[in-house]
Amino acid sequence: MSRIGKKAVAIPSGVNITLDGQTVTVKGPKGQLSWTIAEEITISQEGSDLLLVARDDSKRAKSMWGLSRTLVANMVQGVTTGFEETLELVGVGYRAAMKGDALSIQLGFSHDVNVEAPAGVTFAVPKQTEIKIAGADKQAVGEIAAKIRRIRPPEPYKGKGVRYAGEKVRRKEGKKK
């Protein structure tokens, strides 16, 4: 029995949900998201709640039940409030700037790194050493943040690199003489 799957997804006012077979489409003030639910899950709308139920007791149905409920809840939250990820650039000469819709980052390479924003995701640079990534799709926001961090991850000796806001970097002691 999935404890997460049993909970109903509350639908706030201003959000419109369309069920078309196994496809769920959520429309709200921040945009529109759609996702196809696994065949093992039944979805129904009762008033201002969305209920998901596993069709049988198979292991796959139980595992998809909680996942499906969480993904639908994330879609509802995404079209109402959206998701945001903040990255910090730590290091001498590490800075970011906007060039149109693209992000240009200087990370100590011989060239600038240019990152294009995927559909539905926006970049903002409030400070030269800070990048804000926002969008309605939690997966897309997290994926582009991870791709930017992967360009120059924080190194353990000086802590230089791209890190998530508030991320603690494990530091190592240098060589001893």
Swiss-Prot record:
Cellular component, GO, one term: cytosolic large ribosomal subunit
InterPro entries documented for this protein: Ribosomal_uL6-like (IPR000702), Ribosomal_uL6-like_a/b-dom_sf (IPR036789), Ribosomal_uL6_a/b-dom (IPR020040), Ribosomal_uL6_bac-type (IPR019906), Ribosomal_uL6_CS (IPR002358)
Residue numbers spanned by region Disordered: 157-177
UniProt record, GO biological process: cytoplasmic translation
A GO molecular-function annotation: structural constituent of ribosome
Matching PROSITE patterns: RIBOSOMAL_L6_1
Keyword terms: Ribonucleoprotein, Ribosomal protein, RNA-binding, rRNA-binding
HAMAP family xrefs: Ribosomal_uL6_B (MF_01365_B)
Subunit structure: Part of the 50S ribosomal subunit.
Function statement: This protein binds to the 23S rRNA, and is important in its secondary structure. It is located near the subunit interface in the base of the L7/L12 stalk, and near the tRNA binding site of the peptidyltransferase center.
Family as reported in the entry's similarity comment: Belongs to the universal ribosomal protein uL6 family.
Xref: NCBIfam families: L6_bact (TIGR03654)
Protein name: Large ribosomal subunit protein uL6
